[in-house]
Amino acid sequence: MEALWQRTGDPLGDFIRLVLLVEELLERLGAPKEDTLGAKLRSGAAEAFFQSHPEGPALRGRLWRLVELRNAVLHERAEVPSWAFSEGRDLAARLLAAVERQGFYSRAGGTARMALPEAPAPPPPPAS
């Protein structure tokens, strides 16, 4: 999947790309690629991760909240709230640290991957 995330100034597109990065990280933890995002969170690989993580239950809840927001944005055309980006970045960072520990990324590779989500959103284009 190799999802890269970078703020473009389009909140909907930025949010969907951030969710794709989270989804890729779940796959790298061992969740089946062909599953839905919800099924990936319920997969044995995700459950093993939650059980091994000190904040596992809270992290699971936060990821489900992100999935619910994603569904509302995609299916109900809900607006993307500003908190979604900081929450998504934090969740992606925690998942990335887990896949680094499992050897799927080197520290340098992981740092490069997280440099994009840490970048601020570009300014909106000037009105014509």
Protein language model regions, located:
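Amphipathic alpha-helical interface elements
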Residues: M1-E68, A72-P126
